[in-house]
Regions:
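N-terminal auxiliary interaction/assembly segments of multi-subunit proteins
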Residues: 1-260, 264
Length: 265
């Protein structure tokens, strides 16, 4: 505890100030300690490094979409990762329109689900294209029919299968579609206050543009959060590349040995 001045000491200081022996400017304030506010409703569970690694994963995913989807849609597909951010699940769900197009994805062996949201205009364009049309979106929003959802389920299955490869450097996943929801109220996969990471991807299908949002709850990724850093991601990628290269060399050597062996009659 700081020392407390006696009355005599206070009187002496006042006298020195009044006579000019002391200058008030000589007394400087102690620098205030900077305090960083912490919002308990938005705990910082995703660092910038986590978000950057997720962007790298989905940049890889975007390249797979660009090269695989044209085979089904017979249209040029361009995919670009726009950004990533950490928000609460309620912020994500409250921003959803109705109807919406949500794929609830099981990320086995990780516990919990993720959500893939596809812009409805892209959904309508995909349906039109798969039914023989030119791939134009509807001018006015409406509910998806059961037949249309059945068609979109096949596309979601393709999208989800393509998730496997980009995640290999972090964890080997076996994702599958649990269900499609068109009402955001029925897609409450976690508590509204839980933190999630959202990766936003822009998709252009033959001139029709829309966003795809991937909602990744912290609770789903919790077991692999320590692996969501660029250093780990690139090191495992290099290890896998070296292993693949070694496998190719081994196969080539075995083939040469087999060829060089004399044929026995």
């Amino acid at each position: 505890m700081a020392d407390v001045l006696s009355q005599n000491e206070i009187d002496a200081l006042l006298k020195q100030l009044s006579t000019g022996e002391l200058d008030a400017d000589d007394f400087t304030e102690t620098k205030s300690v900077k305090v960083k506010e912490y919002d308990f409703s938005r705990p910082a569970k995703f660092s910038k490094e986590h978000l950057r690694t997720l962007e790298i994963i989905f940049e890889h995913y975007g390249r797979l979409l660009s090269s695989n989807l044209p085979a089904y849609l017979r249209k040029n597909v361009q995919v670009e990762v726009m950004n990533s951010e950490a928000v609460t699940y309620s912020e994500f769900s409250n921003a959803l329109s109705n109807p919406v197009l949500l794929g609830v994805v099981n990320m086995a062996p990780l516990s919990g689900n993720i959500i893939i949201e596809i812009a409805t205009n892209l959904g309508y364009a995909i349906i039109d294209r798969l039914l023989g049309g030119v791939g134009e979106p509807l001018e006015k929003k409406r509910e998806f029919s059961e037949i249309e959802l059945s068609i979109l389920e096949k596309i979601f299955t393709i999208l989800i299968d393509l998730l496997r490869e980009p995640w290999t450097n972090v964890v080997e996943i076996h994702p599958y579609l649990e269900r499609i929801e068109t009402n955001p109220q029925f897609a409450q996969i976690i508590s509204p206050t839980e933190m999630i990471a959202i990766v936003t991807v822009n998709i252009n299908i033959g001139g029709v543009e829309g966003l795809m949002n991937i909602c990744l709850p912290y609770l789903t990724l919790e077991d692999v959060m320590d692996k969501l850093n660029t250093k780990y991601w690139f090191s495992t990628m290099q290890d896998r590349d070296e292993t693949s290269y070694a496998d190719v060399i081994e196969t080539a050597i075995l083939s040469l040995i087999h060829i060089s062996e004399p044929t026995r009659h």
